[in-house]
């Protein structure tokens, strides 16, 4: 009986919880927190600007197509539990992808002979996962161009000229007198 419970616990730790956590994170990324349609009245004061924000952010599941118009995350702040879940998923992936003593074996082999491309790709993936776990995310820098590009002044759009030039159709009188 103890063996069955131990195997069930190992199965849950290896397969069930990481996949459940990954599904929860994937389902919650990019979706507004008030998707249920109930505005959070406790967090906002009763002012006219906060009421307009509540009305603007309230969505239901039948209007998910309108979500692309809503600016979902105006700042780069990440929810603590979402960040914790992402790090846990990345940690699970890194442990699942890392063979026993992969770094030591591949480094020894690399010194003596060429390494297979799959091992190099696996190490690159592990390094990327390690970087995701250990480095803090910084928002991208805003790059502003100091020079303005000189563009030629175009005449206003005239459908008759366009038809004459592109389509070869004369649209208008023969003489412009």
Swiss-Prot record:
What the entry lists under InterPro entries is as follows: SecM
Task: List the GO terms this entry assigns under cellular component, sorted alphabetically.
Answer: cytosol; periplasmic space
Give the signal sequence positions. Answer: 1-37
* Pfam families the record matches: SecM
UniProt entry keywords in alphabetical sequence: Cytoplasm, Periplasm, Signal
Molecular-function GO terms, alphabetical: translation regulator activity
- The reply on keyword Transmembrane is no
Name the domain of life: Bacteria
- Tell where it localizes: Cytoplasm, Cytosol; Periplasm
What job does the chain carry out?
A: Regulates secA expression by translational coupling of the secM secA operon. Translational pausing at a specific Pro residue 5 residues before the end of the protein may allow disruption of a mRNA repressor helix that normally suppresses secA translation initiation.
**Family, per the entry?**
Belongs to the SecM family.
Q: What is the name of this protein?
A: Secretion monitor
Give the organism, scientific name: Yersinia pseudotuberculosis serotype O:1b (strain IP 31758)
Identify the coding gene.
secM
């Amino acid at each position: 009986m103890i063996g069955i419970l131990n195997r069930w616990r190992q199965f849950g730790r290896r397969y069930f919880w990481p996949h459940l956590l990954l599904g929860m994170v994937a389902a919650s990324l990019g979706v507004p927190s008030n998707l249920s349609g109930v505005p959070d009245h406790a967090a906002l004061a009763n002012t006219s600007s906060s009421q307009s924000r509540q009305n603007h952010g309230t969505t239901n599941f039948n209007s998910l197509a309108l979500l692309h118009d809503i600016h979902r995350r105006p700042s780069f702040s990440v929810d603590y539990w979402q960040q914790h879940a992402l790090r846990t998923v990345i940690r699970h992936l890194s442990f699942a992808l890392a063979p026993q003593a992969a770094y030591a074996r591949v480094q020894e082999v690399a010194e003596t002979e060429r390494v297979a491309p799959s091992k190099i790709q696996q190490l690159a993936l592990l390094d990327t996962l390690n970087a995701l776990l250990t480095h803090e995310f910084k928002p991208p820098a805003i790059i502003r161009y100091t020079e303005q590009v000189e563009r030629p002044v175009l005449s206003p759009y005239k459908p008759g000229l366009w038809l004459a030039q592109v389509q070869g159709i004369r649209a208008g009188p023969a003489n412009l007198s």
